[in-house]
């Protein structure tokens, strides 16, 4: 019995729940959009999901990060032996094969429930997200492709959140929907860019030529400051082009400005401390900037929920990070 308890503790530790808000709130962007457009445009086809259904979707979205993280840890063992030597799978505290088996069983169950209880079509982004997650580690070896693949894997959560809610009217993809998906992709591609700084040494030795490894710390930290403006510039360009037609509330703009501040603060932290012991702890601000950006997008469709999620995400991302005192994990 003791070994099962120890395995469970190591498995949960490896799930790194402080990141779960990334997949959770990215997916809820899709749910919020579905609930917004259904009564206005598609009440004859689409159906507002029940509270029970939404809770299942939310549970799957938050679970998605941790379950898939087990596969990432296994595929990233060579660099993690340097970057994160105290992670359970690296130290042997977590049996890799058993952990992979557990994640596979859970994902199979999620697929089964999605097909038979949620919406069969939601299996498409679900399976796409799993495959993109598996492709992420190899993609890291090819510069910007790691960022591209990671961003797409999180964007699949947004698509899943939308399609899992209920019947979806055609067309599935419009310029407004694609614009929001692009912004979710961009936020996450930027987030993972900053995360590469803490992994510089291990990635370099393991042959993972991320952008930071390819161009070096000094050039990369300057690019980080420049790239922090990309999301806000992109959104303004998209909005001014008329791709987003929903009137934007004052609440959205306030959350948007706060998100821009978090993005700039993230860039400053990595510019000042790009590769030392403080770098790992800059991840909390980096993650907040990404997750709060997701919450701000929800503000386009539901500003009260967006405000709540923004505050909850900001508080609990920091709280969960603070529970992990060992930066080598």
What role is predicted for each listed range?
Residues 1-329:
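Multi-pass alpha-helical membrane architecture of UbiA-family
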């Amino acid at each position: 019995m003791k070994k099962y308890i120890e395995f469970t503790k190591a498995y949960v530790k490896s799930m790194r729940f402080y990141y779960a808000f990334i997949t959770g709130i990215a997916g809820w962007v899709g749910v919020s959009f579905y609930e917004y457009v259904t009564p206005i445009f598609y009440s004859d086809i689409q159906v507002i999901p029940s509270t029970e259904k939404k809770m299942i979707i939310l549970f799957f979205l938050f679970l998605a990060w941790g379950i898939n993280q087990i596969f990432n840890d296994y595929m990233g063992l060579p660099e993690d032996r340097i970057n994160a030597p105290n992670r359970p799978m690296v130290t042997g505290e977590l049996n890799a094969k058993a952990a992979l088996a557990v994640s596979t069983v859970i994902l199979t169950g999620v697929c089964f429930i999605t097909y038979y209880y949620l919406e069969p079509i939601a299996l498409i982004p679900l399976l796409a997200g799993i495959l993109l997650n598996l492709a992420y580690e190899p993609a890291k070896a090819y510069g910007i492709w790691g960022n591209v693949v990671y961003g797409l894997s999180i964007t699949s959560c947004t698509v899943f959140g939308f399609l899992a809610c209920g019947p979806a009217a055609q067309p599935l993809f419009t310029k407004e929907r694609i614009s929001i998906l692009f912004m979710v992709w961009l936020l996450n591609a930027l987030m993972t860019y900053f995360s590469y700084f803490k992994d510089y040494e291990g990635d370099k030795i393991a042959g993972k030529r991320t952008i930071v490894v390819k161009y070096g710390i000094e050039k990369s930290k300057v690019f980080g400051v420049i790239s922090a403006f990309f999301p806000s510039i992109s959104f303004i360009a998209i909005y001014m082009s008329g791709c987003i037609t929903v009137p934007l509330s004052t609440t959205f703009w306030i959350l948007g400005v706060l998100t821009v501040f978090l993005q700039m603060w993230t860039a400053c932290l990595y510019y000042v401390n790009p590769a030392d012991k403080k770098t790992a702890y800059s991840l909390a601000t980096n993650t907040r900037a990404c997750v709060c950006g997701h919450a701000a997008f929800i503000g386009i469709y539901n500003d009260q929920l967006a405000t709540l999620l923004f505050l909850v995400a900001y508080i609990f991302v920091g709280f969960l990070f603070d529970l992990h005192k060992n930066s080598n994990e």
